[in-house]
Amino acid sequence: MSKQIQAIRGMNDCLPEQSGLWQWAEKAIREVVASYGYQEVRTPIVESTDLFKRSIGEVTDIVEKEMYTFADRNDDSLTLRPEGTASVVRAGNEHGLLYNQQQRLWYLGPMFRHERPQKGRYRQFHQFGVEVFGLAGPDIDAEVIALSARLWKKFGISEQVTLELNSLGSNEARETYRKALVEFLLARKEHLDEDSLRRLESNPLRVLDSKNPQVQAAITDAPSLIDYLDAESKEHFHALCERLDALGIQYRVNPRLVRGLDYYNRTVFEWVTDSLGAQGTVCAGGRYDGLVEQLGGKSTQGVGFAIGMERLVLMLQASGAEEFVASPVDVYVTAMGDEVELYALQIAESLRDVMPTLRVQTHFGGGNFKKQMKRADKSAARVALVLGETEQQEEQVSIKFLREDKPQSRIARSELESTLVELFSL
């Protein structure tokens, strides 16, 4: 026997018993973004490596350690996308969607990062995200945060997540803060790990993002970015907080929140949870007013967020959301005898013609009554249509209830559609 091929480490299969919850979550997401008037955009999985070096930043863990990068036959450097924002901006620039326009977009799809697999984190993972372009005010920041809050409400997990908020200010304000932070960190250099020392030279704000407890202890008294904000950024942040207060969205200002990508300015936020272990971020985003121009477009403001779908699904499983997932089958059609199989096939197809939302599965492979009922029960269908020679000869159908304590009944085939419409409230 040949050696069985396994999935690549960190690449996860979504099996039928899991896909129902994914589909339920994706449907809920589509309903919420539609209620805000956002439109879907789909971008390629493979992009030029330069796109991510210029957007995410060359001195980031993603670009330095985690990207799946390869040379194609033309020796061009290509990368499996590690996140969605850069691709959406690239598409917007390329197709003239952004300059002097307002766009509210969303996406959902697979991303790739070569990081250590752990609970809810895989090397191929899925992100849902929204990106808004052409609006500079705090009102749109509030809207995208409100949209994310509405998703938690839709999923029934609002009590499990906390909104953390910060402002990174303008580039000029960050540069002033950067100097103060570097001075502070240099005085505590012996307490920094190798990663933090490297970041100290290239991107000192990222030291604040360190997960090392020793580093965290050393930066407890670090200067706060909020104290260095320019007047316009302070006003923007204050106005955002006012809007969140008016909407009843609770938040906590976290002066250490800097985000792991280089393109953010002003508003940054994360929804965190303690139900997923130490790394508890389930949603993150912020404002990136310079990114469009950085990637070759004309100056256009942007703001958005992304949700890790694997982490979201873990939370939904823990909260019991699977009870809302419909069974994959409503009606299981059986055929007692080879001569009856054609009759069963005709009935199943006629039901799909008349009731396209009804999920009908037909039994194939023969077997006695007991075997077919066992398959019907395993399908999780609510009812089985029992068809034998008598039913075929008399143009009838027997209905057996699989989940309710009701007697089996026989009706005319002509009454089947109306009976099922009433039974399933179609």
Swiss-Prot record:
Compartmental location: Cytoplasm
UniProt xrefs under Pfam families: HGTP_anticodon (PF03129), tRNA-synt_His (PF13393)
Per the record, the GO terms for biological process are: histidyl-tRNA aminoacylation
Gene3D superfamilies, per the entry: Anticodon-binding domain, Bira Bifunctional Protein, Domain 2
Gene Ontology cellular-component terms for this entry are: cytoplasm
Catalysed reactions, as listed in the record = tRNA(His) + L-histidine + ATP = L-histidyl-tRNA(His) + AMP + diphosphate + H(+)
List UniProt keywords, sorted A-Z: Aminoacyl-tRNA synthetase, ATP-binding, Cytoplasm, Ligase, Nucleotide-binding, Protein biosynthesis
Q: GO MF annotations for this entry? A: ATP binding; histidine-tRNA ligase activity
Looking up InterPro entries in the UniProt record yields: aa-tRNA-synth_II, aa-tRNA-synth_II/BPL/LPL, Anticodon-bd, Anticodon-bd_dom_sf, His-tRNA-ligase, HisRS-like_core, HisRS/HisZ, HisRS_anticodon
Is Nucleotide-binding among the key words of this record? yes
Per the UniProt entry, the Enzyme Commission number(s) are 6.1.1.21
Q: Which HAMAP family match?
A: His_tRNA_synth
- Family listed: Belongs to the class-II aminoacyl-tRNA synthetase family.
> How does the record describe its quaternary structure?
Homodimer.
Q: What is this protein called?
A: Histidine--tRNA ligase
Q: Which organism is it from?
A: Pseudoalteromonas atlantica (strain T6c / ATCC BAA-1087)
Q: What is the lineage of its organism?
A: Bacteria, Pseudomonadati, Pseudomonadota, Gammaproteobacteria, Alteromonadales
